Each structure stands twice: as structure tokens, then as C-alpha cells.
Regions:
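Extreme N-terminal signal-anchor transmembrane helix of membrane signaling/transducer proteins, especially
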Residues: 1-36, 300-308
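Cytoplasm-proximal transmembrane signaling helix
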Residues: 16, 286-333, 337
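N-terminal membrane-insertion alpha helix
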Residues: 19-45, 49, 75, 315
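Extracytoplasmic/periplasmic sensory segments of membrane signal-transduction proteins
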Residues: 40-47, 56-145, 188, 202-203
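Extracytoplasmic/periplasmic sensor domains and loops in membrane signaling proteins
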Residues: 81-92, 118-150, 181, 192, ...
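Helix-start (N-cap) segments at beta->loop->alpha junctions
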Residues: 154, 167, 176-185, 202-203, ...
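Extracellular/periplasmic juxtamembrane segments that couple receptor/chemosensory ectodomains to their
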Residues: 230-297, 350
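HAMP signal relay modules and closely related sensory coiled-coil linkers
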Residues: 321-367, 372-373
């Protein structure tokens, strides 16, 4: 194989190596950005779930604080006048229920005896709540507001229990309970994740006796689905192993049937900070898979184009600057050795590099050879 073909093969290999390295680096950078976007989505969703829970707790507290501080309510509660309380609160509480997710409003006498349920005026008068409503017991015992999540007869609620006091002292307490659905709806609206809240099945069975027990398929790893945005979206990704991880906020990427999914777990803590369940959020991450495939395809196509362009450019430059001049010098040297008139090297001789030096040297040799030939001819004459 002559130098021309060796050099062209070498240039082709250099172009391939350069293009492959460039494509690999480009895909690596694109893939890193996509993976970072996935993690950012997961972390943002986890933060938003926690923020939404805290927001609902604050809303429950604001409502309970407002009602418990109204003078007319204090007066009616002290007089144990249920009709007066209902007349003052029921219209506003119906609006709160229908538009803002308030599911419970209840007045409670110490230590934990139900006095009036706003949304069930005739039900539960005098019911003893002390066996399962620790928030109420603590609020009535300490006279301090209690806020957070707790399971009641009608299931899980985001609650705030505020003492009702007048100049004569503690009368009892007023409780607001919000549905968890607001947390789920806000999260899905803002992130696209389908969300569900899962609570310890044993606790729900023992306490939430006014709601039906869910189907067995909605009980996973000892946790039952209390509220979900879309059960069909969550179901394939749930397993006992997932709930075994619910000790802290965690995120995970799961591949199922060739599709990537993002999964977020946020522990549900009761008002005492004890874990009673988890919020699970999932989202189809196939859009990121498509981006990764496009990145791979684009980098491969770019590498192929780069190989063609780089090889062509290198061949043009090397042929013009080196191979063609070397070929001309080689032909001139061969002609000189055979005693033939050499090719014209004037174009190469004007160059200020090594090729120009070689061309000028050959011109000098050619001139010397011509002089010797002329001398011999004159002697022979």
C-alpha cells in the first residue's frame, strides 16, 4: 500500500475516532441533562406535596381559630345552645364544604364528648371520642390548639382543634377537618403526577367505622388507598416493597413494560409526628425516553455527517498541500535519475517550506546535470 492510500486510511480513522468521541460526549451531556430533569421533576413534586399538606393544615387552623374566637359562638357554646350555633354557622359552613373541601366542623366538650356536628346536626350528641381522638383530648386538656392529620370515624382528615374560651375559662373546643383531596388535586394540576394517599389499614379499620372498607386490591402492603386521583395509573406500580421504604421522603425511577415512571413517596405524619401512611405520586416519564432516543439518533446522525465532512476536508487539504507536491517531486526525481527532462517545479520552488526546499534542490541538480551534459557535448564536438 503506497503512502497515498495509507495517509487516506489514516485520515479516515482519525475522522471516525474524532466523530465517535464527539458524539459520545454530546450524547452523554444530553443524557445527563435529561436525567437531571427527571430528578428535578421528582424533587419538585415531593416538595410540592409537603407544601400542599402544610397549606391545608394552615387553612384548617385559620378557620378553626376564626370560629373559636367569635363572641357569639362562645356565648352560644357556653349556654349549650345548639340551635344558636347552627343558625350562625351553618350557611357559611355549607359554602366552606361545597367550595373549599371542608368536610367536618364539630364542637366538643371536655374531655372529648361530641356536642354538635355542623354537617350532621342531629347525630352524635354526647358521643365519647376519647378512645380515638387524641387531638381533641390534648386540646381540651392543655387548652392549646392542635393541628395536623388524624383518623376519625369518617376517615383521614387534615384537622385543627382550637380551644373555645371565655372569661370564665375553657368551654370546649372547635374542630375543622379538611379533605385530603385538595392536596391530591393541587399536586396533579401543578405537576401532572397522579397521586394517592395510603393509610395504615389497621388504624383505618379500628377507627374509621363510618366508611366502607375498600376492595382488597386497594390494600397494598398493609396500607389502604384512602383517596386517589386515578387508581389505574397508580395500581401497576404499587407493591409492599414500595411501602416498606416509607420512612422518609424518597424518589425513584421505575421501568415497567419498557416504560419509565417517576415515583415519589412522602410519609403521612399525624399531629404527633408519627408515621401513619404515605402519599404516593407517579407519572409516566416516556417523554424523557423519547428525548433520550432523539438525542441518541441526533448524535449518531451528526457523527456520520462529521465523518464525511471531516474526512473530505482532511483529504482535500492533505492532497493539495502534501500528496500532490510529493508526487510531483517524486516524478521529477525519477525523470532526473533516468536522464529525462524533469517536470516543471517552478510552482513548488516558490514555496517557503520543506517542499519548496526540495523543489529548489531538484532544480539545482537539474541545472548541474544540464551543465555537465553541455560540457560533454562541447568536448565531443
Amino acid at each position: 500500500m503506497n503512502i497515498k492510500w495509507k495517509s487516506q486510511l489514516l485520515l479516515f480513522m482519525v475522522a471516525i475516532t474524532t466523530s465517535v468521541v464527539s458524539a459520545y460526549s454530546g450524547f452523554g451531556a444530553s443524557n445527563a441533562m435529561i436525567e437531571s430533569a427527571k430528578k428535578r421533576e421528582l424533587n419538585t413534586t415531593a416538595t410540592l406535596i409537603q407544601s400542599n399538606i402544610n397549606e391545608q393544615i394552615n387553612k384548617a387552623s385559620a378557620r378553626a381559630s376564626l370560629v373559636s374566637s367569635l363572641p357569639s359562638i362562645k356565648q352560644a357554646f357556653r349556654a349549650k345552645d345548639r340551635d344558636a350555633i347552627a343558625t350562625r354557622l351553618l350557611p357559611a359552613m355549607i359554602v366552606q364544604r361545597d367550595q373549599f373541601g371542608v368536610r367536618e366542623g364539630q364542637f366538643i366538650l371536655p374531655p372529648a364528648s361530641s356536642f354538635l356536628r355542623i354537617y350532621a346536626l342531629k347525630d352524635g350528641h354526647g358521643e365519647d371520642l376519647s378512645g380515638f381522638r387524641q387531638m381533641v383530648l390534648v386540646a381540651n386538656r392543655t387548652g392549646e390548639p392542635q393541628r395536623g392529620m388524624e383518623i376519625g370515624r369518617r376517615g383521614l382528615s387534615i384537622r385543627a382543634v382550637y380551644p373555645v374560651k371565655d372569661d370564665d375559662g375553657l368551654i370546649g373546643s372547635f374542630e375543622i377537618g379538611l379533605s385530603f383531596s385538595s392536596v391530591l388535586t393541587q399536586t396533579k394540576t401543578n405537576t401532572g403526577f397522579d397521586v394517592g394517599v395510603f393509610i395504615d389499614d389497621k388504624l383505618m379499620t379500628e377507627v374509621a367505622q363510618l366508611i366502607p372498607r375498600p376492595d382488597n386490591e386497594r390494600i397494598v402492603g398493609g396500607y389502604q388507598a384512602v383517596e386517589v386521583t386515578d387508581w389505574t395509573a397508580l395500581k401497576p406500580l404499587l407493591s409492599p416493597a414500595i411501602f416498606a421504604k416509607v420512612r422518609d421522603v424518597s424518589t425513584e425511577l421505575i421501568t415497567l413494560n419498557g416504560n419509565d415512571y417517576g415515583l415519589v413517596l412522602v410519609p403521612v405524619l399525624d399531629y404527633k409526628g408519627e408515621r401513619i401512611g404515605a402519599v404516593v405520586a407517579v407519572r409516566d416519564f416516556s417523554e424523557f425516553q423519547i428525548q433520550q432516543r432523539w438525542a441518541l439518533t441526533g448524535n449518531i446522525a451528526m457523527a456520520a455527517l462529521q465523518i464525511v465532512l471531516l474526512t473530505g476536508a482532511l483529504l482535500i487539504v492533505v492532497n493539495a498541500m502534501l500528496l500532490k507536491p510529493f508526487e510531483a517531486i517524486a516524478n521529477a526525481s525519477k525523470d532526473l535519475a533516468e536522464g529525462k527532462p524533469s517536470s516543471d517545479l517552478e510552482d513548488l520552488a516558490v514555496r517557503k517550506d520543506e517542499i519548496g526546499d526540495m523543489a529548489r534542490s531538484l532544480q539545482t541538480l537539474q541545472a548541474s546535470d544540464n551543465d555537465r551534459n553541455g560540457y560533454k557535448e562541447s568536448q565531443n564536438a
